[in-house]
């Protein structure tokens, strides 16, 4: 299994979630976060924002589905402007459902 963490623009979060659902990946967690990337914040005239609001999406999928999920997020979250986000993929050793105590996805 893989954990996909996508840091995206908040205004694209619904579009990305809908695209993932349409592609067969309805399960996700969304978290409002703030942070900065390589650009170290953003300046508008004389106002400087050190940290920028983003949305983090967490999705756990089978190994074979990871690249497809990355493609869906990349396409649906794209604006072409600085700050579109970043996607991270990590291995997941196991998953358990709390209610049923079932193991796996």
Swiss-Prot record:
Cystine bridges: none
A GO CC term assigned to this protein in UniProt: cytosol
GO MF, one annotated term: enzyme regulator activity
UniProt GO BP: nitrogen fixation; regulation of nitrogen utilization
Pfam families: P-II
InterPro entries, A to Z: N-reg_PII, N-reg_PII-like_a/b, N-reg_PII/ATP_PRibTrfase_C, N-reg_PII_CS
Domain of life: Archaea
SUPFAM superfamilies: GlnB-like
Keyword terms, alphabetized: Nitrogen fixation, Transcription, Transcription regulation
Family statement: Belongs to the P(II) protein family.
Reported function: Could be involved in the regulation of nitrogen fixation.
Name this polypeptide is given: Nitrogen fixation nifHD region GlnB-like protein 1
Provenance organism: Methanothermobacter marburgensis (strain ATCC BAA-927 / DSM 2133 / JCM 14651 / NBRC 100331 / OCM 82 / Marburg) (Methanobacterium thermoautotrophicum)
């Amino acid at each position: 299994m893989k954990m996909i963490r996508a840091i995206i623009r908040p205004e694209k979060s619904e579009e990305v979630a809908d695209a993932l659902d349409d592609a067969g990946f309805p399960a996700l967690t969304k978290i409002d976060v703030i942070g900065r990337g390589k650009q170290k914040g953003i300046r508008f005239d004389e106002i400087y924002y050190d940290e920028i609001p983003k949305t983090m999406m967490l999705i756990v999928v089978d190994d074979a589905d990871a690249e497809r999920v990355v493609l869906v997020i990349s396409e649906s979250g794209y604006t072409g402007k600085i700050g579109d986000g970043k996607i991270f993929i990590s291995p997941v050793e196991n998953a358990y459902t709390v209610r049923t105590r079932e193991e796996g996805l």
